[in-house]
């Protein structure tokens, strides 16, 4: 298997053996074979990526993530699923996709998406709907967009994006705070925390030498 990784601050473009194009967001990892089989095209994603899948009706394309499997023949879509996060989101830009449980013993269909729809999973709860804007792909231009997300989700994302370990000493902060904002990658992690502080009272200590942040 070949491995492609997007380093800090970089959106990495990868062209797969069948001509499929993949853009990896910050800290994302993609595993794929040197050559696809004649029956199916399988890749494994840890992180966020945008896919433009080369059309081949005879050989389906699968994106494996920790909890959910995406099945397509040729389409454009975004998938975000970081290992250990218990969350998943797929946004369909063009074409259609099928979503299945990623279980080695038994795959079960969850739902199908058509153009302009999204599917999300958070701690085992499913949600589908219409995409509200084009901000879903803003990360491809180095912009991070958060729309009423739990504070924990924002912290998990920026910890990955900027390669910091974030420790929260007051768990109530994670339970009560939700965040909305749009940030440039070049703004840096401390700028993001200062902006969030304007709406939610918390203190933080940052250790840039060891890439550690403590929030209380």
Predicted regions, residues:
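A residue-level detector for the "anchor" residue at the start of short, highly conserved motifs
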Residues: 1-216
């Amino acid at each position: 298997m070949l491995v492609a990784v997007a380093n800090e601050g970089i959106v990495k473009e990868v062209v797969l053996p069948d001509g499929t194009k993949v853009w990896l967001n910050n800290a994302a990892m993609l595993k794929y074979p040197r050559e696809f089989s004649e029956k199916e095209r399988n890749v494994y994603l840890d992180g966020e990526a945008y896919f433009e899948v080369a059309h081949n009706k005879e050989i389906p394309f699968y994106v494996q993530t920790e909890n959910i499997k995406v099945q397509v023949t040729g389409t454009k879509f975004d998938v975000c699923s970081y290992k250990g996060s218990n969350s998943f989101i797929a946004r369909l830009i063009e074409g259609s996709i099928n979503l299945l449980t990623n279980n080695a013993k038994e795959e079960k269909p969850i739902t199908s998406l058509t153009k302009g729809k999204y599917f999300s999973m958070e701690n085992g709860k499913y949600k589908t709907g219409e995409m509200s804007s084009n901000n879903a792909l803003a990360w491809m231009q180095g912009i991070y967009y958060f729309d009423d997300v739990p504070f924990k989700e924002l912290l998990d994302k920026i910890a990955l994006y900027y390669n910091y370990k974030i420790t929260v000493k007051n768990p109530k902060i994670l339970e009560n705070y939700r965040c909305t904002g749009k940030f440039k990658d070049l703004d840096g992690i401390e700028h993001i925390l200062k902006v969030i502080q304007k709406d939610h009272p918390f203190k933080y200590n940052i250790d840039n030498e060891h890439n550690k942040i403590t929030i209380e």
